[in-house]
From Swiss-Prot:
GO terms for cellular component: cytosol. It catalyses: chorismate + L-glutamine = anthranilate + pyruvate + L-glutamate + H(+). L-glutamine binds at residues 55-57, 86. The active site is at 82 (nucleophile). Pfam families: GATase (PF00117). The gene is trpG. Part of a heterotetrameric complex that catalyzes the two-step biosynthesis of anthranilate, an intermediate in the biosynthesis of L-tryptophan. In the first step, the glutamine-binding beta subunit (TrpG) of anthranilate synthase (AS) provides the glutamine amidotransferase activity which generates ammonia as a substrate that, along with chorismate, is used in the second step, catalyzed by the large alpha subunit of AS (TrpE) to produce anthranilate. In the absence of TrpG, TrpE can synthesize anthranilate directly from chorismate and high concentrations of ammonia. This is Anthranilate synthase component 2. CDD domains: GATase1_Anthranilate_Synthase.
Length: 91
């Protein structure tokens, strides 16, 4: 199975470290800023995994992240790093 990984970027430079590390496992990675992607676009992409990056602020400041976790978290594995992990807890 070819993995299709979505990284939701919460405006943090560490996002591209995640991109590089994950790229060693799977070349199929797309990165979108938390305010530049919609739930519909995520559904279209049909990701096998979602990574939610670190970022400044609080989960409520993380754009679409909480909505995405609520909608897709039951059937798509989601990894949250720092703010992303907090967003999982908030959702």
């Amino acid at each position: 199975m070819i993995e299709n990984i979505l990284i939701i970027d919460n405006y943090d430079s560490f996002t591209y470290n995640l991109y590089q590390y994950v790229g060693e496992i799977s070349p199929n990675i797309e990165v979108y800023r938390n305010d530049k992607i919609t739930l519909e676009k995520i559904e279209e992409m049909n990701p096998t995994h979602i990574i939610i990056s670190p970022g400044p602020g609080f989960p409520k400041d993380a754009g679409i992240c909480i909505e995405a976790i609520r909608k897709f978290g039951r059937y798509i594995p989601i990894l949250g790093v720092c703010l992303g992990h907090q967003a999982i807890g908030e959702a």
